[in-house]
């Protein structure tokens, strides 16, 4: 990643007590993946390099967008890597990704987002993960997850909220509902007439009384 980011395990970086090291996600094992496909009846019967079953090629649509430079590159990498195990990836790299997402026209939707803009974990779950979340484009639904987030909403102790955030992340990881790729190391550039700008993990807190534009 050339120091531009760190591999992600969960939704939050390790700077949070409930971040990366607090949860576990499956590692990528291509040989085991091939084995699982074969056990499910997906094999390459026509020699084109892709698994097929009952005359149908194993093909998925990968939805992303071009305004974040890393997104098309990630799609290309997935296209190459998944081909090695027999899965065809058709990339839809479009500025109109939101429309496709809302219409459910994807198998994998990859986007970038700030999961804790105010330094609190609840936002990510309520906006993206719970059953009625506005950005739950994959229609993931788990009563167990919803109950955890309801409890988080009613809990004010920071340590307890952190524990619930760990439990919630582990739930969606165990359900294979979401996967996380990287946590970016962001760089800030300002003009010479800007002073008092200090980088902060939560971008709301970069706007302070010391920030001045002359």
Q: For each predicted feature, which ranges?
A:
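A generic structural signal for short
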Residues: 21-22, 66-67, 86, 137, ...
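Append "and occasionally in soluble cytosolic enzymes with long acidic Gly/Pro-rich linkers
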Residues: 1-77, 167
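Ligand/substrate-recognition segments at binding pockets and active sites
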Residues: 44-115, 186
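Short, solvent-exposed loop/beta-turn-alpha elements that line the ligand-binding surface or hinge
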Residues: 18-35, 45-58, 102-104, 124-154, ...
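Sec-exported extracytoplasmic/periplasmic mature domains
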Residues: 1-5, 17, 38-43, 80-87, ...
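Stable alpha-helical elements in mature extracytoplasmic
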Residues: 8, 29-36, 70-74, 78-81, ...
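Solvent-exposed loop/turn segments at secondary-structure junctions
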Residues: 3-7, 16-19, 66-70, 96-98, ...
